[in-house]
Amino acid sequence: MHFLTIYPNCSSGVVRAQSRTEQKNPLGLDDLGIQNLGQTVSLAPAVEAASMLKMEPLNSTHPGTAASSSPLESRAAGGGSGNGNEYFYILVVMSFYGIFLIGIMLGYMKSKRREKKSSLLLLYKDEERLWGEAMKPLPVVSGLRSVQVPLMLNMLQESVAPALSCTLCSMEGDSVSSESSSPDVHLTIQEEGADDELEETSETPLNESSEGSSENIHQNS
């Protein structure tokens, strides 16, 4: 049964396999010429790796805590930057969405204005066309009107003449009645005047006769 002894401080990195006899004779019996008891094995890479593994835990006490704390810090920093990026992304998306909506509204308003302008132009053209159609038969209409005007005047004269005659008749009747009433008044006035004169004339003879009779009476007495 062989045992391996590792010498980490050995520069050559030689590992020596010892037997039980060598373990019992630690004084170095190999100096006596006994070479079959031990075999030299070159395990330099394995020894270096083992020595590094043994040295790293000794030297990495503080860096271990630093390494354990650094992922937390990196995660916290990554979380903060991630939140900032998310907010920025949301703002960018909302701004693009708002710009898109504003563009849609502006396009809709422009289309409505164009439709209104086109409708106004169509109405204007229709009115011009109707006005032109109405203005074309004006000479014929003027001729017809020139023919119809005398007829209308005749009709008006025929319709107005009876009314005028009726009004004239009524006015004449009023004047005749007024004239007939005025001679009656004059006659009554004249009759009253004649009656007064007759009374005066009748009174004067009576007075004279009474005076004469009174004188005769005085004379007879």
UniProtKB/Swiss-Prot annotation:
<dbReference type="GO" id="GO:0086091">
    <property type="term" value="P:regulation of heart rate by cardiac conduction"/>
</dbReference>
<feature type="topological domain" description="Cytoplasmic">
    <location>
        <begin position="108"/>
        <end position="221"/>
    </location>
</feature>
<keyword id="KW-0325">Glycoprotein</keyword>
<dbReference type="GO" id="GO:0015459">
    <property type="term" value="F:potassium channel regulator activity"/>
</dbReference>
<dbReference type="InterPro" id="IPR000369">
    <property type="entry name" value="K_chnl_KCNE"/>
</dbReference>
<protein>
    <recommendedName>
        <fullName>Potassium voltage-gated channel subfamily E member 4</fullName>
    </recommendedName>
</protein>
<comment type="similarity">
    <text>Belongs to the potassium channel KCNE family.</text>
</comment>
<dbReference type="Pfam" id="PF02060">
    <property type="entry name" value="ISK_Channel"/>
</dbReference>
<feature type="compositionally biased region" description="Acidic residues">
    <location>
        <begin position="192"/>
        <end position="202"/>
    </location>
</feature>
<keyword id="KW-0633">Potassium transport</keyword>
<keyword id="KW-1133">Transmembrane helix</keyword>
<dbReference type="GO" id="GO:0060307">
    <property type="term" value="P:regulation of ventricular cardiac muscle cell membrane repolarization"/>
</dbReference>
<dbReference type="GO" id="GO:0016324">
    <property type="term" value="C:apical plasma membrane"/>
</dbReference>
<keyword id="KW-0472">Membrane</keyword>
<dbReference type="GO" id="GO:0005249">
    <property type="term" value="F:voltage-gated potassium channel activity"/>
</dbReference>
<feature type="region of interest" description="Disordered">
    <location>
        <begin position="58"/>
        <end position="77"/>
    </location>
</feature>
<feature type="transmembrane region" description="Helical">
    <location>
        <begin position="87"/>
        <end position="107"/>
    </location>
</feature>
<keyword id="KW-0851">Voltage-gated channel</keyword>
<keyword id="KW-0813">Transport</keyword>
<dbReference type="GO" id="GO:0097623">
    <property type="term" value="P:potassium ion export across plasma membrane"/>
</dbReference>
<dbReference type="GO" id="GO:0008076">
    <property type="term" value="C:voltage-gated potassium channel complex"/>
</dbReference>
<feature type="compositionally biased region" description="Polar residues">
    <location>
        <begin position="203"/>
        <end position="221"/>
    </location>
</feature>
<keyword id="KW-0406">Ion transport</keyword>
<comment type="function">
    <text>Ancillary protein that functions as a regulatory subunit of the voltage-gated potassium (Kv) channel complex composed of pore-forming and potassium-conducting alpha subunits and of regulatory beta subunits. KCNE4 beta subunit modulates the gating kinetics and enhances stability of the channel complex. Associates with KCNQ1/KVLTQ1 alpha subunit to inhibit potassium currents.</text>
</comment>
<dbReference type="GO" id="GO:0044325">
    <property type="term" value="F:transmembrane transporter binding"/>
</dbReference>
<dbReference type="GO" id="GO:0086005">
    <property type="term" value="P:ventricular cardiac muscle cell action potential"/>
</dbReference>
<feature type="glycosylation site" description="N-linked (GlcNAc...) asparagine">
    <location>
        <position position="9"/>
    </location>
</feature>
<keyword id="KW-0631">Potassium channel</keyword>
<feature type="compositionally biased region" description="Polar residues">
    <location>
        <begin position="58"/>
        <end position="72"/>
    </location>
</feature>
<dbReference type="GO" id="GO:0019870">
    <property type="term" value="F:potassium channel inhibitor activity"/>
</dbReference>
<feature type="topological domain" description="Extracellular">
    <location>
        <begin position="1"/>
        <end position="86"/>
    </location>
</feature>
<dbReference type="GO" id="GO:0098915">
    <property type="term" value="P:membrane repolarization during ventricular cardiac muscle cell action potential"/>
</dbReference>
<feature type="region of interest" description="Disordered">
    <location>
        <begin position="175"/>
        <end position="221"/>
    </location>
</feature>
<comment type="subunit">
    <text>Forms heterooligomers with KCNA3, inhibiting its activity by impairing localization to the cell membrane. The stoichiometry of KCNA3 and KCNE4 in the heterooligomers are 4:1, 4:2, 4:3 or 4:4 respectively. Increasing the number of KCNE4 subunits steadily slows the activation KCNA3 and decreases its abundance at the cell membrane. However, a single subunit of KCNE4 is sufficient for the cooperative enhancement of the inactivating function of the channel. However, a single subunit of KCNE4 is sufficient for the cooperative enhancement of the inactivating function of the channel.</text>
</comment>
<keyword id="KW-0407">Ion channel</keyword>
<keyword id="KW-0812">Transmembrane</keyword>
<keyword id="KW-0630">Potassium</keyword>
<dbReference type="GO" id="GO:0086011">
    <property type="term" value="P:membrane repolarization during action potential"/>
</dbReference>
